[in-house]
């Protein structure tokens, strides 16, 4: 059966799952630098490409040049990322910081939003944002933090993307400020519809209202969605 075309589709702001979006959802597929370009994507399937902090030890200046080339090559690429900082992984933190700073500059130069992987480095990230003063918006994906952490990030102008595990008060704070997105990340059996259903119950609003608001936010946060066809 062909899925019903929704006026306000689900938006999966960050996914590593290979399936393409259908009539019910827009998907932002997160690709690493060495993964294939998304020329085959059509309709509601888009991509982000970035230098993940786990890869920082093997990155070079040439990696930055290749990243810029890939970001420019396809209009289906709507964001840079995932970039980020991770104090738990074994990659030297100094290299993570260097390449993250360079990705921030690149995102600003190309007018692309930045999708961020963040593990135990929130204070560093907040300081960097204050120092670098980027004009492109920053979205932290897979946010599971407490309301106090969410409040600090929201005060600093971040957007937060939530998966199947989230703190209900943190989601409510971000949603109330128009800075929440939802995602499936790397869980292939998880549907974006189920994440929306859980979030709508937590927020005490209808599924339709949630879809409408997050869809409108996505068109603003990811402006290349509009350049690729307007209303999906």
Explain the meaning of each model-derived region.
Residues 1-232:
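Mid-domain alpha/beta scaffold segments of enzyme catalytic cores
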């Amino acid at each position: 059966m062909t899925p019903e075309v929704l006026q306000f589709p689900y938006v999966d702001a960050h996914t590593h799952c290979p399936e393409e979006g259908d009539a019910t959802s827009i998907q932002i597929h997160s690709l690493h630098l060495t993964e294939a370009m998304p020329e085959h994507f059509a309709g509601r399937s888009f991509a982000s490409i970035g230098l993940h902090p786990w890869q920082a030890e093997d990155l070079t200046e040439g990696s930055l040049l290749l990243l810029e080339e890939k970001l420019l090559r396809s209009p289906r690429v709507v964001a840079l990322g995932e970039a980020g900082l991770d104090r738990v992984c074994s990659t030297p933190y100094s290299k993570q910081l260097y390449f993250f700073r360079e990705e921030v500059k690149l995102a600003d130069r190309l007018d692309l939003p930045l999708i961020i992987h963040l593990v135990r480095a929130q204070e560093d990230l907040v300081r960097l944002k204050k120092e670098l003063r980027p004009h492109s918006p920053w979205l932290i994906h897979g946010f599971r933090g407490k309301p106090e952490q969410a409040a600090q990030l929201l005060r600093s102008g971040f957007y937060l993307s939530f998966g199947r595990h989230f703190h209900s008060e943190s989601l409510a704070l971000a949603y109330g400020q128009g800075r929440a997105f939802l995602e499936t990340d790397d869980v292939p059996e998880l549907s974006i519809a189920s994440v929306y259903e859980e979030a709508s119950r937590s927020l005490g609003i209808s599924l339709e209202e949630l879809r409408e608001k997050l869809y409108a936010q996505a068109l603003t946060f990811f402006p290349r969605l509009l350049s690729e066809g307007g209303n999906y």
